């Protein structure tokens, strides 16, 4: 199964022109600021600003990647996490639906695969990832789990959902709060890629659609559940942040996860090489606003409180091949070979396959042979944590848990 959250960027170049034509200059109209109303999100009590550590767990990782909920425990990651976002549920016919029901609720775990060392039985009412998450929460009572819906591949259904936000919210609530697993989940994460803009498909629901949908979700889930959302990091004028009313919708979320990674990559097959998750700008950066500081500054400038913004980090790298120049900005012949697909690989692989030998824009890069990769390391994450703290951000989130080493090198660098 494809990894729908992370793999949105290869299509960016293909859809950019079409997106502009479809959406036009109206993206900037009515550029609101954050406001409040009766359905606003309550102050989150379970984690103080700056302390949230949110990691995505991919449903399909239990197959080819052989990454299970038990690995969250054995790597030490569970001791660092405050929240897990379970990715992904689907959006179909205007409703929240299951992603892979077998992986989520039916896959049987042996004793050695299980979080608590107890094997599943054939007749128990719940198996799969959900039951393993239940066991993980029993070991870590303060750990919260949210069910994330959408992602790169499954966001097309949000267009239909936006036509009747209340019905969508009801369907999500009914699914998340199903009596078989209601105790597993503490809320919902909306990952719409992208409202009134283009991802794998183009949405033309209008600038207000996102605020209306998030209002309905908060109204249905109420103040006792968490409501969060992954949002774009494109801070350019007329870009994806301008396309929807993220400021107006901020009142309905406990926090936003701006996806400050995948800024650059081998979807531009010939280069120029550039780090996919720069913290800051640097001389020669291909697009001026494509870095985390620009994203955070733009969102704060819209009036979104700092403590409702988390800093995003990728536990993976992006790379090119056919590169002779060590420094960023070189030409390439195409994407570098990755373990599962071209142009991308996990940190746990890259740290030995192509060790970092340079830094730029607050992140690391590596030139080995004719391959050029960029990724974060424990050292560059430490620098990003300094920035997060200086800005008073609400914490850190990352994509995704299986990219880290077996002993959790990257998550241990997050404070």
Where are the regions a protein language model picked out?
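Secretory targeting and sorting signals
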Residues: 1-38
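Conserved, mostly hydrophobic/aromatic
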Residues: 84, 147, 190, 217, ...
